[in-house]
Amino acid sequence: MTTVLDVQRFKEEGQRFAVLTAYDYLSAKTLDEAGIPILLVGDSLGMVMLGYPTTLPVTMDDMVHHAKAVCRGAHQALLVGDLPFMSYHASVEQAITSAGRFIQEAGMHAVKLEGGGRVVEIAQTLTGMGIPVMGHLGLTPQFVHQMGGFKVQGKSDKQAAMILADAKALEQAGAFSIVLEGVPSDLATRVTKALRIPTIGIGAGPGTDGQVLVLHDMLGLTTGKAPKFVKRYTNLAEEITRAAQTYAKEVGDGTFPGPEHSYSSNGSATPAKAKLDEMKYGSSV
């Protein structure tokens, strides 16, 4: 199983690594079997699973629910739970409680939190209690209103210096890695070279130690214009649409279900008493 020590070793050995989001049992199982070393149960589930316009409405209960499902599906990947908006902002005590839920209730191995500044103190407290922490700097979606929207961060010298300082502070606080989102490539490379811990980029160019994408973006499940940093490796939205339309047509014209999908009471054919143990998950509604 991948551990935080393995992630550190990736950087030391110059081994680039992939991270993907996972929000449910089947996606986690599939990605785990594909060998993805880190799965992030991101608060982005609010947008791609729950239909919210931002991540802000996502609650800790939402996150724990999905994280539990991911934990049931993945057994080799390092599992990281994303602390949602207002689950760690009120106090250090609140942060401890929220992070503890991810570890105790949901079976996560680590937590992610956004921002620098006072978040550094929270990161230090959590790591001191044995809870591994992944930082997140640059375009931090929980600060979307303060940033005036989803905009690239760190373009000015002042912003860049602040991101670098926050990254060093998070490393000092004990974070095992840092996500750099929506920052110029040269800044991400500079931060990566300045740190002993790995950086994970999303919209941060090729100079980070690892890369992360939202699963639904990578699979082409999200529609409309994708952000510049997204590469769609397939287009499942089109595939699903085509399959659903074909299914509906076959039901309508009576070609589905055919004999091969039906049970028979004829003794020479399939026994009338179906072998329920042969019915895999997903076969029964």
PLM regions and their residue ranges:
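Alpha/beta enzyme core
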Residues: T2-K228, T234, E238-G267, K275-V285
